Amino acid sequence: IPADPVCVIYLLMADYAYRYYGDKSVCESEYEHLKAWVEYLKSRSKGYITDYYYYGDWVLPYPETVQPDNIFVSTAYLFWHLKEMKKIAEIVGNKADIALYKKDIELCRKAINDKYFDAETKNYSRGTQTENALAVSLGICAEKHTAEVAENVYKDVVARNYHCTSGNVGYRHVFYVLAEYGHADAVVKILKN
């Protein structure tokens, strides 16, 4: 049984070894395995929308009536895998794969926006904190809409008396988005709750 699509740490470890230590040996030695994992995830999607999940945004702090669409969460993580694989291809200098993953990133971004973005409400999927934060944090959201989608994350946090409704997969992205879009104070309030 393959891992959940939200298991991006394999690629992040290779990227971080290079980013923080200048060591590209992990990227080089693991390259074919990293690529095989990403290609497997691509094979489990139709038009860049994944077809499975095991956990999605798991361990939500409260029983929410509206929970994140776990296929959306897995698909957003497919997008993140594609971005990470392109970075790793750049680190090792694989020009063909750089071009391949650049194209995949754009096609995946388009598929997610076409299927999940509501241009009227400026929400992704069901409009949960996780879904909107993933879209902004990972770069799925079009730049012209990022501030509005980020503001929807903030408004939802405020409406819930500074509580985060995201689980293990989404909370960090909620914090990233709040901090990046001028609401670091909201992160502090969430943590104090």
Region annotations inferred by a language model:
Residues 1-193:
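Active-site core of glycosidic bond-cleaving carbohydrate-active enzymes
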